[in-house]
């Protein structure tokens, strides 16, 4: 085919059935804009391809065929939106602008031209005349400047019902449109649309229902893509029982969890188990829906190594009858693919290494290309053998990917920017979890992520204790380093036992963070302020700060932060004895755990539910919660299981008065102080005061105070059930762990009862009585609700020694009942208040004594 030299003054006419497509002389257009376009020549020029559509009798047509013309205009708008074009509308004129930075802009313009051709053919009876002109303008040209450019055609006699293009547009479109020179008319005639490739037969043995394990992905990613490409219909779900359906959708949260953490180098076992359970159930339903379907083959790349082979073999766990095969070799001629189309193909190939199959349409929508554009692209990729499986971006052989990469090397920064910007959007939506692996992915794509993302990752990785000793030299001179330095200083001030100073520093730190809008660091600081106020028994203030932390977690859409904030709110309400609100937030926590699959919070959530039930005298319910927590911990968090067993045994002992738990308590009392506490308490409740040699261990207060910055972290081993609640407040205020304090009180009470009626032991009796009263007095002074129990035990001893009328006896009982009354102040429901005062074992004894002494 002979083409006239570039820059010649030429025009062309294309006869396509009833339409005409002409190439106009370059001289017809405004030289003002042309000068901008002429400054850059060849394939590297910055351009914007535009399509100008005019309906000469638009207003008359809107009166004669209002519905048809409105439908035609709506279609044009849809063409623009679906192909990533900016559409400018002015009376009878429509201008489609395909910006230079938009990937595949020429291919998108050709799709738009084809759609316009077919649509105007459909509306032939209504629209007799129209003019369509294609030209190239400067990429930064304004809509007014573009419209002025196209108005120049009015001085040229152009046939009605015509498609026209400038010489520059022809140079861009020549890979998609066939042009024949007409020397006599000094024009180009376009015969039609070029085919990119000859139709090739479907590769033998290849099926669309296949699992492709790429060299850069895991078997879990391959299974996710297969399930996304072949979703189960609603009809399949309708055959499930309500219980199975609920279980299936519960497990689906594991898939979402995996997708959020897709770049992590390792995954917890509970995720792997739930994921495989979900996939196993999926395949069961998949085969039930298509009983005669063959097991989907598992494909690996022709050049796949040993690791890819191992990943592919793991798929056999859920699909054991699937054959393991290699993808057929590709015969793709990458050089024959138009440059801009190759760029789009490579973009999809590279993006498929970072996103899943059900995110591809979303990705192209982010690039302003709709589903039909993606469908056409997949068709082109398959017919050119870029992909070996129809509509599957994961079946692109590695050598084809590498060839495409060499072809589009110049455009690589733009392509990386498109993918990383989409991933950044996913991160902001909460669909990607902040982690060092995510940061590494952004670095790989050369994306400049924000400082808040780095902080978000650090606060995910490290607890406050770890951050206090974190080496931050690598962040020196950055916003991250400045924030970490301020936050570290706050923590270190707190560790020097100056609570007020730590609070002031935290408030100053918060002001700095809010000014810079570092939401993740703001979340952590609000949590720190909440713990500082909890440590001072300011529960109302703590609820405010934890509430702000919850708002930040919701803004970040971070499941782990959300669960943490909900748990902190629940334990604050628990410490306040507002059990209704505590249960409400534990219920919200349970929902968040299910939604985000943050299973590491499940054990402590169940444990605190058990503690609330225990406080209200619901011993059977408490036992069920502790047993469920222990069973789950045994599977995935073995270090948490013994403590749950200890508390379950305690609840069982309270519920059925069984003493079978004694052996468990004795085995574990050396490692778990709660076991020793419950062992002593069980003897006291059973009135077994016959062995003075028992319980000679009296844990005293620690010699050095704990740091005044209280905190709770799942990363720290938990040896006491009080450490996530009471120890944060009263255990720190008196430097006496709550479990040790309780066991000491019960041990002193036990020995008071043992030596009470032994004249030779009265000195020992008074020693234990004084110790018991000293601990009770201090608990009363600091507002510890346990003072009600301690003072009741003091009352019981005084009653047995001095009688009910003695002043000391009455004083102990009065103070004990006053503490209990103060404890029910936040219980708004009468039933809850009654449960707490009359169903709880020790509270019921105190309540009965108060009634007997006319205090109620």
Swiss-Prot record:
TPR repeats (start-end): 107-140, 523-556, 603-636
UniProt superkingdom: Bacteria
Cysteines engaged in disulfide bonds, as pairs: none
InterPro entries, alphabetized: TPR-like_helical_dom_sf
Keywords, sorted A to Z: Repeat, TPR repeat
Descriptive protein name: TPR repeat-containing protein TP_0123
Organism from which the protein derives: Treponema pallidum (strain Nichols)
């Amino acid at each position: 085919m002979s083409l006239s030299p570039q820059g010649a003054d030429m025009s062309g006419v294309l006869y396509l059935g009833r339409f005409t497509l002409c190439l106009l002389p370059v001289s017809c257009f405004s030289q003002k804009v042309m000068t901008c376009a002429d400054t850059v020549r060849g394939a590297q020029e910055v351009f914007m391809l535009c399509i100008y559509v005019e309906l000469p009798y638009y207003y008359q047509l809107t009166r004669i065929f209002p519905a048809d013309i409105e439908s035609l205009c709506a279609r044009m708008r849809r063409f623009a939106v679906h192909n990533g074009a900016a559409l400018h509308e002015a009376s009878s004129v429509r201008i489609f602008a395909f910006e230079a930075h938009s990937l595949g802009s020429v291919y998108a313009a050709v799709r738009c031209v084809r759609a316009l051709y077919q649509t105007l053919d459909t509306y032939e009876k209504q629209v007799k005349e129209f003019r369509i002109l294609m030209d190239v303008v400067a990429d930064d040209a304004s809509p007014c400047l573009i419209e002025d450019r196209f108005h120049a055609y009015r001085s040229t006699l152009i046939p009605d019902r015509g498609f026209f293009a400038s010489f520059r547009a022809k140079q861009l479109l020549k890979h998609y449109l066939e042009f024949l020179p007409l020397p006599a008319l000094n024009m180009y005639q376009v015969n039609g649309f070029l085919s990119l490739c000859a139709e090739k037969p479907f590769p033998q043995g290849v099926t669309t229902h296949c699992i492709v394990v790429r060299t850069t992905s895991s078997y879990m990613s391959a299974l996710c893509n297969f399930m996304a490409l072949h979703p189960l219909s609603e009809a399949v779900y309708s055959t499930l029982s309500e219980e199975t359906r609920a279980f299936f959708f519960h497990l689906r949260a594991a898939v979402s969890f995996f997708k959020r953490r897709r770049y992590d180098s390792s995954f917890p076992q509970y995720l792997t188990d739930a994921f495989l359970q979900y996939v196993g159930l999926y395949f069961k339903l998949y085969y039930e829906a298509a009983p005669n379907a063959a097991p989907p083959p598992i494909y690996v790349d022709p050049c796949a190594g040993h690791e890819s082979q191992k990943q592919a073999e793991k798929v056999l766990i859920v699909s054991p009858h699937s054959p393991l095969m290699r993808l057929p070799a590709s015969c793709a001629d990458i050089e024959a693919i138009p440059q801009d189309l190759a760029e789009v193909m490579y973009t999809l190939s590279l993006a498929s290494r970072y996103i899943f199959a059900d995110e591809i349409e979303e990705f192209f929508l982010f690039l302003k290309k709709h589903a039909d554009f993606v469908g056409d692209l997949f068709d082109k990729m398959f017919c050119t053998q870029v992909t070996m499986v129809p509509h599957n971006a994961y079946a692109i052989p590695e050598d084809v990917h590498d060839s495409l990469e060499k072809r589009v090397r110049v455009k690589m920064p733009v392509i990386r920017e498109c993918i990383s910007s989409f991933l950044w959007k996913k991160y902001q939506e909460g669909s990607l979890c902040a982690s060092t692996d995510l940061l590494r992915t952004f670095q790989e794509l050369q994306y400049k992520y924000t400082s808040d993302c780095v902080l978000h990752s650090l606060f995910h990785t490290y607890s406050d204790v770890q951050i206090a000793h974190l080496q931050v030299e690598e962040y020196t001179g950055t916003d991250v380093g400045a924030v970490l330095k301020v936050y570290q200083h706050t923590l270190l001030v707190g560790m020097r036992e100056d609570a007020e100073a730590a609070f002031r520093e935290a408030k100053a730190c918060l002001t700095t963070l809010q000014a810079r809008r570092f939401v993740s660091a703001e979340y952590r600081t609000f949590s720190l302020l909440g713990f500082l106020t909890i440590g001072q028994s300011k529960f109302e203030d703590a609820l405010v700060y934890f509430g702000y932390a919850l708002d930040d977690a919701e803004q970040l859409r971070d499941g782990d932060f959300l669960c943490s904030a909900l748990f902190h709110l629940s334990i604050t309400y628990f410490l306040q004895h507002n059990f209704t609100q505590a249960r409400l937030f534990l219920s919200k926590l349970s929902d968040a755990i299910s939604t985000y699959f943050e299973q590491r919070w499940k054990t402590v959530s169940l444990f605190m539910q058990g503690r609330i039930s225990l406080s209200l005298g619901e011993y059977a319910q408490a036992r069920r919660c502790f047993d469920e927590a222990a069973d789950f911990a045994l599977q995935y968090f073995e270090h948490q299981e013994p403590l749950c067993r200890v508390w379950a045994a305690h609840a069982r002992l309270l519920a059925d008065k069984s003493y079978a738990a004694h052996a468990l308590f004795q085995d574990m009392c050396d490692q778990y102080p709660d076991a020793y506490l419950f062992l002593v308490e069980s003897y006291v409740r059973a009135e077994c005061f016959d062995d003075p040699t028992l319980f000679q261990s009296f844990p005293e207060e620690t010699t050095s105070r704990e740091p005044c910055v209280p905190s709770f972290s799942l990363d720290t081993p938990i040896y006491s059930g009080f450490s996530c609640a009471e120890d944060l407040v009263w255990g720190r205020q008196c430097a006496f762990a709550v479990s040790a304090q309780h066991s000491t009180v019960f041990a002193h009470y036990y020995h008071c009862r043992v030596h009470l009626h032994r004249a030779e032991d009265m000195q020992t009796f008074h020693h234990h009585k004084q110790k018991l009263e000293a601990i009770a007095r201090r608990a009363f002074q600091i507002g510890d609700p346990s003072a009600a129990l301690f003072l009741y035990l003091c009352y019981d001893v005084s009653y047995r020694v001095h009688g009910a009328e003695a002043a000391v006896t009455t004083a102990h009982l009065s103070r004990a009942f006053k503490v209990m009354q103060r404890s029910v102040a936040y219980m708004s429901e009468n039933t809850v208040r009654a449960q707490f005062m009359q169903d709880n074992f020790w509270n019921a004894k105190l309540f009965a004594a108060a009634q007997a002494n006319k205090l109620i």
